[in-house]
């Protein structure tokens, strides 16, 4: 059985990639990024969005695979239809760099749609 230190990546990560970060204040990707920056998080923060150059003063990366420094926690704030692709990027990053220790998926549009595709 794992000990409590295995949860450090969730509760005290050295770095966080916010996948689906947004410059639009009405989007969850903006709120999550803003909260990390305004509530005293001291680690490195990497916004990820292929359509943005920078968000809230931080350089934005097109993909998780483009971040040149270690990433410990990934926070997914993408549409349900993109989640599997992003999960594949996380697996590929872990294979290449061995650095992603945890991920949190806060995407909407799965089972609550009550469609076979969403439930899959």
Map each language-model feature to its residues.
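Catalytic-core regions of core metabolic enzymes
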Residues: 1-120
